């Protein structure tokens, strides 16, 4: 087992780091800069690919969670289509919940009964943990319900897949909206790509299971790309174990003005025979109104290469999910 832990470490005696230079890296990965940085670092130290893996990390992972986009031939392999009977069961669960007079936060398997669909959802949950790691449920009649009832259905169905909801923000919200705010908010007030039409780069969200509900079909684009982090790991472990070592060491995670101004933790862990990667690029590069803070340690050249390598390998092995309204 690896010696790293998931603990966030608060930093004391934070200094000004303006004299230390942040690498030439931005939120949007630049393939040419990545290739140049890789060539430069390997030229300076040709032995980097010979670096031993961190203690406890496997040379390769064998699992159904290791896959490439080309392994999937048709969306019928990951899309589960709801039947008319199952949609009627969901509607009955909505009416049952309203009859209880409870707040939306009480949506659960007991308050949102799905006697026949529930076991199917539990089976799909097992597919997340022990199978391919993803699925699409298609499709809920969004226009037939109020937004409040849509949230109820989302929470009720999700409770059969992952019964414990995680906080999305410091206020304790468990539901976040992905919406373009660039036309209604000042240009300098948006610090996250989820609130623009900008392309989001590969990242992981906090939580064991992450779900999305599509309220509309995109007029343009709209494909959501996912990738197997375990497949990316195998490629790195084989060709660039030094970057595995870099990812498994502490990184300064920007707090963007919080107290403390940054926390220190690895991005990559191997615990209980499972690989865990937890990162979002903007905490190391900044994004629009939230640039990388100047009073925290800049990332290193090795870390910059690791970030870009993660992205471009994930992109290479990715699968596109074409979300439809109600998915």
What is each PLM-predicted segment?
Residues 147:
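Catalytic palm subdomain of template-directed nucleic-acid polymerases
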Residues 2-117, 122-123, 130, 135, ...:
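Active-site environment of non-heme Fe oxygenases that use a 2-His-1-carboxylate facial triad
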């Amino acid at each position: 087992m690896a010696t790293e832990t998931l603990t966030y470490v608060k930093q004391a005696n934070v200094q000004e780091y303006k004299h230390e230079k942040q690498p030439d890296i931005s939120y949007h990965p630049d393939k040419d800069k990545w290739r140049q940085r890789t060539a430069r670092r390997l030229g300076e130290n040709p032995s980097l690919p010979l670096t031993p893996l961190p203690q406890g990390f496997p040379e390769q992972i064998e699992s159904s969670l290791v896959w490439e986009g080309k392994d999937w031939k048709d969306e019928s392999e990951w899309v589960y289509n709801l039947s008319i009977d199952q949609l009627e069961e969901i509607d009955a669960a909505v009416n049952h919940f309203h009859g209880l007079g409870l707040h939306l936060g009480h949506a659960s398997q007991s308050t949102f009964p799905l006697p026949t669909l529930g076991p199917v959802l539990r089976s799909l949950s097992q597919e997340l943990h022990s199978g391919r790691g993803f699925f699409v449920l298609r499709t809920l009649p969004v226009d037939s319900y109020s937004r409040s009832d849509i949230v109820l259905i989302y929470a009720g169905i999700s409770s059969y897949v992952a019964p414990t909801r995680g906080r999305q923000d410091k206020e304790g919200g468990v539901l976040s909206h992905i919406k373009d705010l660039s036309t209604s908010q000042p240009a300098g007030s948006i610090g996250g790509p989820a609130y623009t039409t900008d392309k989001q780069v590969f990242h992981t969200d906090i939580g064991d299971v992450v779900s999305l509900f599509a309220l509309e079909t995109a007029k343009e684009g709209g494909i959501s790309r996912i990738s197997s982090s375990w497949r990316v790991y195998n490629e790195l472990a084989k060709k660039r174990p030094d970057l595995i070592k870099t990812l498994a060491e502490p990184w300064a995670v920007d707090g963007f003005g919080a107290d403390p101004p940054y926390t220190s933790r690895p991005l990559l862990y191997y615990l209980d025979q499972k690989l865990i990667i937890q990162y979002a690029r903007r905490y190391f590069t900044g994004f629009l109104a939230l640039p990388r803070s100047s009073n925290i340690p800049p990332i290193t050249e090795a870390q910059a290469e690791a970030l870009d390598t993660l992205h471009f390998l994930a992109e290479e092995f990715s699968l596109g999910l074409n979300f439809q309204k109600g998915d």
